Amino acid sequence: MALSKDEKAATLKEFGLHETDTGSPEAQVALLSARINQLTEHLKDHKHDHHSRRGLLLLVGRRKGLLKYLASTDIERYRSLIERLGLRR
C-alpha cells in the first residue's frame, strides 16, 4: 500500500522545493496526502480493515502537525500548499 517510486518522485517533483527535496514541509505534506488518499480509497472497499484505519488516522495526525508548523512559520507557503493540494482548512 506504499507509494511506488514513480508516484513518490512525481509528487516530490511537483511539491518539493528542488528535485531531491524530501525534507521541506511542503514535500512531506504532499507525500502524506498521497498516502492518505490511497488509504482512503482502500478503506472504501475494505470497511472492516481497522489496522489500516488506525494507520490512516496516524498519517492524518502527522500531516496536521506539519501543516500547523508551516502555518506558524510561513503563512503564505501554508495557504499556497493547501490550495494546491485541495485541502479544507
Curated annotation (Swiss-Prot):
InterPro entries: Ribosomal_uS15, Ribosomal_uS15_bac-type, uS15_NS1_RNA-bd_sf. One of its GO terms (molecular function) is rRNA binding. GO terms for biological process: translation. It comes from the Bacteria. Keywords: Ribonucleoprotein, Ribosomal protein, RNA-binding, rRNA-binding. GO terms for cellular component: cytosolic small ribosomal subunit. One of the primary rRNA binding proteins, it binds directly to 16S rRNA where it helps nucleate assembly of the platform of the 30S subunit by binding and bridging several RNA helices of the 16S rRNA. Forms an intersubunit bridge (bridge B4) with the 23S rRNA of the 50S subunit in the ribosome. Belongs to the universal ribosomal protein uS15 family. HAMAP family: Ribosomal_uS15_B. Part of the 30S ribosomal subunit. Forms a bridge to the 50S subunit in the 70S ribosome, contacting the 23S rRNA. This is Small ribosomal subunit protein uS15. It comes from Corynebacterium urealyticum (strain ATCC 43042 / DSM 7109). The gene is rpsO.
